[in-house]
UniProtKB/Swiss-Prot annotation:
Single GO cellular component term: cytosol
Main enzyme class: oxidoreductase
Active site annotation, chain numbering: 169, 218, 288
Family: Belongs to the MurB family.
General function of this protein: Cell wall formation.
EC number(s) from the headed UniProt entry: 1.3.1.98
GO annotation, biological process: cell division; cell wall organization; peptidoglycan biosynthetic process; regulation of cell shape
Name of the protein this chain belongs to: UDP-N-acetylenolpyruvoylglucosamine reductase
Pathway: Cell wall biogenesis; peptidoglycan biosynthesis
PROSITE patterns: FAD_PCMH (PS51387)
Organism expressing this protein natively: Wolbachia pipientis wMel
Subcellular location: Cytoplasm
Domain FAD-binding PCMH-type positions: 26-189
Cofactor: FAD
Length: 295
């Protein structure tokens, strides 16, 4: 690849096929995949490149388009997968920590309030970005402070939960960010009670979601005063399919790659569902899955 990249301490990989790296098993090639070895390495890269910088986490809620991703794609690795207890029912976690691991760590520390995270695929960084939530709880309710690197100026910032301006499945920060660390706070509880709640969340998820299929979580956010899956179902979308992509019969707010679908199949099917709901209810569904790459 004939491009000039800053000299870093982390790892560059070139021409990476994203269909091998995403939960949906779709997507073209990323020009450059970069795993920084620490925050300083990450900030140095951003400050010393003119290439566009994108961010991926566990890739559990993204569609990478068939054309791939231009520029540099950052993925936090094991160096950002640390979890430690701070005392006073507080936990510090790096941006690459899986949310399920955070939930189990909290349980082992007898810290309650984070059990809902056990059923959410993805990382701390991704969960902070989208204010991930389930069963009436969300990241905003348990996060205390956040460290983030701005993708435009490359500087490190720290925000309180209030400064994030959280709302349903989003936040109010301007610009593009990569969330590298967060502090969470729960309440003390008995281990057996926490363990029971963890089991209940997992069982509920297993009963209602297509966990064994190639999916990327919920397609759409719930519109105000509606549930997305109900609108999709009542719009007659349950049997829709395009190419190798179809709507899950177990939970119709999930896309499935069931037969070698392309990214275009999945994105077009999602847009077809959007159009059907708009025509039936005059409600505009908003993607919860992130779509990366250009046409």
């Amino acid at each position: 690849m004939l491009i000039s990249l800053p000299k870093v301490r982390g790892i560059y990989r070139y021409d990476v096929l994203m269909s091998k790296a995403t939960w949906l098993n779709v997507g073209g090639r990323a020009d450059v995949l970069f795993k920084p070895c620490d925050i300083e390495d990450l900030t140095y890269l951003i400050k010393n490149t003119e290439l566009p910088v994108s961010v991926i986490g566990a890739t559990s809620n993204i569609i990478v388009r068939d054309s791939g991703i231009r520029g540099i794609t950052v993925k936090l690795g094991k160096e950002f997968a640390y979890i430690k207890s701070k005392g006073n029912n507080s936990i510090v976690a790096g941006g690459a920590v899986l949310l399920s691991n955070l939930a189990h760590f909290a349980g082992n520390q007898q810290i309650s309030g984070l059990e809902f995270l056990v059923g959410i695929p993805g990382t701390v960084g991704g969960g902070i970005e989208m204010n991930a939530g389930a069963y009436g709880s969300d990241i905003a309710s348990v996060v205390q402070s956040i460290k983030a690197v701005n993708l435009e100026d490359g500087n490190l910032y720290e925000f309180s939960s209030e400064e994030m301006g959280y709302f349903y499945r989003g936040h109010s920060l301007k610009g593009n960010w990569i969330f590298v660390e967060a502090e969470f706070k729960g309440v003390n509880s008995e281990y057996e009670l926490i363990l029971q709640r963890l089991k209940e969340v997992i069982e509920r998820k297993n009963k209602s979601q297509p966990i064994r299929g190639k999916t990327a979580g919920c397609i759409f956010k719930n519109p105000k005063n509606y549930r997305a899956w109900e609108l999709i179902d009542k719009s007659g979308c349950l049997r829709l399919n395009i190419g190798g992509a179809r709507i899950s019969k177990k939970h119709c707010n999930f896309l499935l790659n069931y037969d070698n679908a392309t990214a275009s199949d999945l994105e077009n099917l999602g847009n077809k569902v959007k159009d059907a709901v708009k025509d039936k209810f005059n409600v505009e569904l908003e993607w919860e899955i992130r779509v990366l790459g250009s046409y």
